[in-house]
Amino acid sequence: MAVRMSKVERQRLLKEKINTNPFYTDDELAEMFGVSVQTIRLDRMELGIPEVRERIKSVAEENYQKVRTITGTEVVGELIDLELGKRGISIFEPTEDMVFVKTKIVKGQYIYSQAESLAMSVIDASAALIGVANIKYKFPVKVGDRLVAKAEVIRQRGNKYFVWVKIKVKDKEVFRGKFILVAIDEDFLKKRSDTVEVSN
């Protein structure tokens, strides 16, 4: 028979866990501690810890300020980590209006949009376009799935950035993309020309 920990000890460990990873859901925490979701919610309320959506939103707001190529509102999902020119992480939870009616599977355009906007966010340029996208959808996604996208700038050659994006639901990779982004010159933006040369 397992020994139950005291409420004080559980709350201390809960606070520690959330400080280490603010993105744990109440369900995940309940499973970790072997208690009900209701118990975790009560513990969080007593400790003054907001729910996961609020914690994610708070972290994301700080990261939106760092993005140069697009505005924070154009990022699909919540930008929870960003090291400009190197890497980034976003979390996205598709809603009911994003699925095919018959199958209830999330439309690929939303998954791609998360990957594309994260790739655009991680590069250190004031403006850019996708020059090439090599993508692969590996498994279907449903409403309720939490998509965690990780982007990494693999290399930069002149005005081209090579970015890999992988999206997972829990530990299963559902999408993979290799993007070549082309940084747009500041002078070009000032001229407002109609054509951009995107070559490989």
UniProtKB/Swiss-Prot annotation:
SUPFAM superfamilies xrefs: Thioesterase/thiol ester dehydrase-isomerase, Winged helix' DNA-binding domain
One term of GO molecular function: DNA-binding transcription factor activity
InterPro entries: HotDog_dom_sf (IPR029069), Thioestr_dom (IPR006683), Transcription_factor_FapR (IPR017275), WH-like_DNA-bd_sf (IPR036388), WH_DNA-bd_sf (IPR036390)
Gene Ontology BP terms: fatty acid biosynthetic process; negative regulation of DNA-templated transcription; negative regulation of fatty acid biosynthetic process
Pfam family, one: 4HBT
Disulfide bonding pattern of the chain: none
Superkingdom per UniProt: Bacteria
UniProt keyword annotations, A-Z: DNA-binding, Fatty acid biosynthesis, Fatty acid metabolism, Lipid biosynthesis, Lipid metabolism, Repressor, Transcription, Transcription regulation
Family: Belongs to the FapR family.
Function: Transcriptional factor involved in regulation of membrane lipid biosynthesis by repressing genes involved in fatty acid and phospholipid metabolism.
Protein name per its UniProtKB record: Transcription factor FapR
